[in-house]
Amino acid sequence: MRLPEKFEDRMKKMLGDEYDDFIKSMDETPIFTGIRINTSKVGAKDAVIKEFGELQNVPWCSDGFYANKSKISGNHPYHLAGLFYFQEPSAMSTVSALNIESDDYVLDLCAAPGGKATQAGAFIGKNGLLVANEIVKNRANILSDNIDRFGLTNAVVTNETPQKLAEKYVHFFDKIIVDAPCSGEGMFRKEPQAVDEWSVEHTVSCGVRQKHILDCAMKMLKGGGYIVYSTCTFAPEENEQVCAYMLENYNVELVEPNNLDMLSKGRGEWSNSKCDMSKTRRIFPHKNNGEGHFVALFHSLDNYESEVNKPKKTSMTDAEKVYRQFEKEFLNTELDGEFCLFGEQLYLKPKCIDVDKIKVVRNGLNLGIYRKNRFEPSYALCLTLKKEDFKNTVDFECDSEELKKYLMGNTVECDKKGWSAVTVNGYPIGWGKASNGILKNHFPKYLRLKR
């Protein structure tokens, strides 16, 4: 790989005797991909591991595995059912560093495409909250789709600037994830265009931007809360030097990140300060099976309280009444929460957050479409529930022709009546509506297989 001369010179100074091993690793093309199991779906880990054989565990993520690129694809039924997520193994370290509790309010400030948001969301229970933000609209839509497929309920997707969120949610979140936009040096092996875009000036400008994002994050953090900061670059200007800025400007401390003892420590001499960086962590491709990455965990030493008012409870609407009738007829479970209608889309929104004057892509769980006093359930609702939550299910084996026909958008034979969940080996993958021995296909058109 042809690397920028100034990049090589800097890495020589940083790594010393390790430089030759590092530069050799940059010429190696990884044959593995990373997958992370969706632990919120009961038994998913066993099912996926059985399907793909012996998988090597990612050392810093108990639910992450290395998989052979040639043996797994995004069209696999288990991926479409939200049982696993493709994610660079190094990127799994960011959320692993946090100890997320089920009732935490968590913000992922730079969340697309959704790897870290779905990883965090798997820990969050009915009393917790995930807000996943993405400033670019089309990327926010992709983020929302991935959260839908993962079956997360108490998750809101926003499309805002960090500044706008900071004005709205003052000292609101227990934990904040800042996987900051960066120069991408750690991804040179997988994304050659990042090499062409690299310059010393770019790394410096990224550092300025990252500090601004962290300024906004600090305004939203509760007293005693945690911010995990990460990048996929080797540049000290974006890593240790950004951490030094935090330590020098805020009442925070660096703490040992969870689950990352096996990784290299950051260096204080790279921070251009007297700050101790031994509690930060780095991933280097010549030392670990993963691309370049940096992680730091900050703990707030302040004790201020949240300044955010909770939203008022709304009264039952006609849309909710129609949904409750659908629920009574076709489900064995009753969802708890508050309902809101965005156009024709009916959402079950988290009770704890006010999104007034915020650009929202997903205001909680999308239940389905309410139109002319009728309700049509969503793909997101199906993937949130478990097989036992449905009154009607049509189960197919993972490698069956019937499942392939369904995923291509075709009708299949069925002895049920009305709305039915199609499941793959017991895991919901989409809806169908049965009548006269035929299951009409309601698998999302944008996900349907071509052949």
Residue ranges and their predicted role:
Residues 1-50, 291-294, 301-451:
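Polybasic, low-complexity RNA-engagement segments
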Residues 33-92:
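Conserved AdoMet
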Residues 103-112:
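Conserved class I S-adenosyl-L-methionine
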Residues 113-126:
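Conserved SAM-binding loop of SAM-dependent methyltransferases across substrates and taxa
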Residues 124-125, 221-223:
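Helix-to-beta-strand junctions that scaffold the AdoMet/dcAdoMet cofactor pocket
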Residues 133-171:
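S-adenosyl-L-methionine
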Residues 138, 175-216, 232-240, 258-261, ...:
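Mobile active-site "lid"/loop adjacent to the S-adenosyl-L-methionine
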Residues 173, 226-229, 233-348:
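Class I S-adenosyl-L-methionine
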